[in-house]
Amino acid sequence: MPLFELFRLTKAKLESAQDRNPSPPVDEVVELVWENGQISTQSQSSRSRNIPPPQANSSRAREIGNGSKTTMVDEIPMSVPSLMTGLSQDDDFVPWLNHHPSLDGYCSDFLRDVSSPVTVNEQESDMAVNQTAFPLFQRRKDGNESAPAASSSQYNGFQSHSLYGSDRARDLPSQQTNPDRFTQTQEPLITSNKPSLVNFSHFLRPATFAKTTNNNLHDTKEKSPQSPPNVFQTRVLGAKDSEDKVLNESVASATPKDNQKACLISEDSCRKDQESEKAVVCSSVGSGNSLDGPSESPSLSLKRKHSNIQDIDCHSEDVEEESGDGRKEAGPSRTGLGSKRSRSAEVHNLSERRRRDRINEKMRALQELIPNCNKVDKASMLDEAIEYLKSLQLQVQIMSMASGYYLPPAVMFPPGMGHYPAAAAAMAMGMGMPYAMGLPDLSRGGSSVNHGPQFQVSGMQQQPVAMGIPRVSGGGIFAGSSTIGNGSTRDLSGSKDQTTTNNNSNLKPIKRKQGSSDQFCGSS
């Protein structure tokens, strides 16, 4: 079957379906006339008519709203020239150039979010060219039915198809009478498909919190009253039902995003006042968002708080010093670090206890050495020990001064005992021995009778030495008294003559023994 025969059959079906709607005759031959920059049609009766309002997306609207075969008829002129159908009606019809229609109308349907808004004058010129290119397939109505707008037809087509059946159509006011409606009905399509706006603090939370927040905001937006936007009244023409139903659809006008955010914030504040009693403890990031309600995921702040408490407890147990009797055992920590800390603390406490025990033992021994010491404090006991040692040193010095002669430690004692003069003096006094141990008696000769015990000293040429306490006389000669075993002393001076005789008889030995004494002192 040729393509024009198929078109003729479909045109007959279309005319039979549209007989109930009054329409002007469309079978008359018309001419295309260019007048004042616009294309118009002129019939045989010389009546000039203006081009109907732009119908860029009439085919898309009929496909969505009606669901009938009119879409096939409207799409056939894309590939079939009108000359094939016009030859059967009038042979004198002048063929026209096959002009390809503009694709802006179709791009606005599929790429509505991307395409830029088009002015009304450009749409009228494009639609006029498309309509005059195929004059036999365009149907004009006298105001009862007109092609819906591109944006509103796509926005409302699915609802009309599901509510009123496949044989219903929409009748919206012409876009030419109110050209500002085009820009007002484009923006709601963009904002209606997007999820509701979320506050800035919601972006800082996990995805699960954001999901519940979006759902709650969506419910709140549906329940909250909004300001009355622009209202379009649409008249529905039923093919089977004789009743006319008027459908009021509110299309939200395009408002700035800042105003929408302000509305959402005000709604959130109202909702928060109502649900302040039901607020759940949340983290610092989500504070102030009590409208979210109880979240599905577990609270992160509670876990963090619980772990911090456990760490503080473990640290306090490690630092606390345990007493000897009441000793606490550190609780089992969940981490290996806590167990290591507890072990190190136990070892440290054990070593400290042992050190304190040793110190206590030494202090008890010192307390026993100090007479009449009843102090318990360590500092007090040490003070008592210091005072006692000072008193002992003073007593030793007094006893050494009372003996009458006190020589330096380098002369009195060997080099090994020079550091302990007081102890050596006390030892000599306790044994009944004089200070000048190892020094010869200068007042007597070698044949003189020694009254004390004698012993030989190395380096002294094996001469007997009398142990006596020497005294310094005025003439520089040593004249001392010998010590008797019972501790009594005998004066050797006697009378004056005896003293002179003793001195004369001992002059030579004195010189000889002085040299030996000098030799001992030099060797020492």
UniProtKB/Swiss-Prot annotation:
Transferase found in the keyword field: no
PROSITE patterns in alphabetical order: BHLH (PS50888)
Disulfide bonds: none
Descriptive protein name: Transcription factor PIF3
Phenotypic consequence of residue 220 to I: In strain: cv. An-2 and cv. Su-0
Key words, A-Z: DNA-binding, Nucleus, Phosphoprotein, Phytochrome signaling pathway, Transcription, Transcription regulation
The record's account of how the chain is modified after translation: Phosphorylated by PHYA; this phosphorylation is repressed by PIA2.
Gene Ontology MF terms: DNA binding; DNA-binding transcription factor activity; identical protein binding; protein dimerization activity; sequence-specific DNA binding; transcription cis-regulatory region binding
Chief place of localization: nucleus
Segments of skewed composition (Polar residues): 149-163, 173-194, 284-300, 483-507
PANTHER family xrefs: TRANSCRIPTION FACTOR PIF3 (PTHR46807:SF1)
Compartmental location: Nucleus
Known function: Transcription factor acting in the phytochrome signaling pathway. Activates transcription by binding to the G box (5'-CACGTG-3'), particularly in the dark but barely in far-red light. Acts as a negative regulator of phytochrome B signaling. Represses chlorophyll biosynthesis and photosynthesis in the dark. Recruits the histone deacetylase HDA15 to the promoters of chlorophyll biosynthetic and photosynthetic genes. HDA15 represses their transcription by histone deacetylation. Promotes the expression of MDP60 to modulate hypocotyl cell elongation in response to light and ethylene signaling.
Organism: Arabidopsis thaliana
Induction: By UV treatment. Repressed by red (R) and far red (FR) light treatments in a phyB- and phyA-dependent manner, and via a PTAC12/HMR/PAP5 regulated process. Up-regulated by abscisic acid (ABA), ethylene (ACC), auxin (IAA), salt (NaCl), cold and heat. Follows a tenous circadian rhythm with slightly higher levels at the end of the light phase.
Native organism taxonomy: Eukaryota, Viridiplantae, Streptophyta, Embryophyta, Tracheophyta
Residue ranges, compositional bias (Low complexity): 40-49
